[in-house]
From Swiss-Prot:
Protein name: UPF0754 membrane protein SERP1382
Origin superkingdom: Bacteria
Keyword Repeat part of the UniProt annotation: no
Topological relation to the membrane, as annotated: Multi-pass membrane protein
InterPro entries: DUF445 (IPR007383), UCP032178 (IPR016991)
Species, as recorded: Staphylococcus epidermidis (strain ATCC 35984 / DSM 28319 / BCRC 17069 / CCUG 31568 / BM 3577 / RP62A)
Residue spans crossing the bilayer: 4-24, 356-376
Listed PANTHER family: UPF0754 MEMBRANE PROTEIN YHEB (PTHR35791:SF1)
Length: 376
């Protein structure tokens, strides 16, 4: 009986020692969280293994994740899988449908991004438009008009001179034939007679003032139809045109005048475009064809563009993200108690098995120690 009790006692003692030893060993992985000192000497095994090796563990985990788990090749493969492609395309379709069904405006979309679209468009249009025009003027103000304008345009203008001659003659005939033209001729003739006095008054002995005015009107109309008159007008216009096109730009229009005209054109352009109204109207009303185009063709192209663009620039993206450093920094920010609970939650069964194995091995060792003690 004494022998059996000795063996049982040794088994229980060995099991307790083995189990408790494993429990202490597991605890020592995490505890203590900080080193303890006696005088100036640090107590061995403080802090625990994981707190002590925390930075190294974080660095190794980051390295493993970057080099073996989340690699560039793996991400490329995932991006090009049909499931990923379909998911991206469905997301694009969803956003397009939202644009179509909701009263989403350009102003509202810009507002989400913190942009005042009306102010931005007005600023961009004003600065770009005026800067372009001012730059063009500064670059060309000392050049002749014939050097600035295309030759085809100059030839076309020259070809219009005969048409202008015919136009001027026709307008002159219409004016001279009108009641106003007849009245103006009579008034000018009356003024002329009054200024020239008696000598001119002698003409009235042979012709009345009305007949003289009628004669002048008839002759002026005839002159507008005479080929020689038309040739003279054409020659004058040609000479003026040649003189005009050989002038420098700044002789034709001064810099301040050009700026004033540019501002007037810009104001008219803004009024015509009415961009403020367009930014406050639903996109489906402003550009319905664009929404239809997005539905019919763009979603697939955008999906291809996103996948190809991401794959192409993935190396640079991964470098900028620096996954290894990101994981390392994140792990180093974790509270040690949180890390302990996390590991215990993950390996709870295995840790319990280790403690149980400690009890079993301790009991077996205790059994053999008891047997040996009987024979010693």
């Amino acid at each position: 009986m004494h022998t059996i009790l000795l063996v049982v006692f040794m088994i229980i003692l060995g099991a307790i020692i083995g189990g408790v030893t494993n429990m202490i060993a597991i605890k020592m992985l995490f505890h203590p969280f900080k080193p303890y000192y006696i005088f100036r000497f640090r107590i061995p095994f403080t802090p625990g293994l994981i707190p002590k090796r925390r930075e190294e563990i974080a660095r190794k985990i980051g390295q493993v994740i970057e080099e073996h788990l989340i690699t560039e090749e793996l991400i490329r493969q995932k991006l090009n899988q049909p499931q990923s492609r379909n998911m991206i395309q469905q997301l694009i379709h969803k956003q397009i449908s939202k644009l179509k069904n909701d009263d989403v405006t350009i102003k509202k979309i810009a507002g989400f991004l913190g942009i005042d679209v009306n102010e931005l468009v007005d600023y961009k249009l004003t600065t770009k438009f005026l800067n372009k025009l001012n730059f063009w003027y500064e670059s060309n103000k000392y050049r002749k008009l014939s050097e600035i304008l295309p030759q085809s345009f100059l030839d076309q203008c020259k070809g219009q001179i005969e048409y202008i001659t015919d136009f001027l003659c026709e307008r002159a005939r219409n004016y001279l034939s009108s009641e106003k033209g007849e009245r103006d001729i009579y008034e000018l003739l009356d003024t002329f007679f009054n200024e020239k006095g008696r000598i001119i008054g002698l003409l009235q002995m042979f012709m009345t003032k009305e007949s003289i005015a009628d004669r002048i009107q008839h002759e002026l109309i005839r002159l507008t139809q005479h080929p020689q008159s038309q040739k003279i007008i054409t020659k004058v216009l040609n000479d003026e045109y040649e003189t005009f096109k050989d002038k420098n730009l700044d002789e034709i229009i001064k810099e301040q005048q050009f700026k004033n005209y540019s501002q007037l054109v810009l104001n008219e352009l803004k009024t015509y475009l009415n961009l403020k109204d367009k930014t406050e109207r639903p996109i489906k009303q402003v550009v319905p064809q664009f929404i239809q185009f997005l539905e019919d063709d763009t979603s697939k192209r955008m999906t291809d563009f996103i996948i190809k663009g991401t794959s192409k620039h993935l190396t640079n993206i991964m470098k900028k993200i620096n996954l290894r450093q990101l994981v390392e920094e994140q792990i180093n920010t974790f509270d040690l108690k949180y890390i302990e609970n996390l590991i215990i939650d993950i390996a709870n069964k295995e840790l319990k098995l280790i403690m149980t194995l400690g009890f079993i091995l301790g009991g077996i060792i205790g059994f053999f120690q008891g047997v040996i003690a009987i024979f010693v």
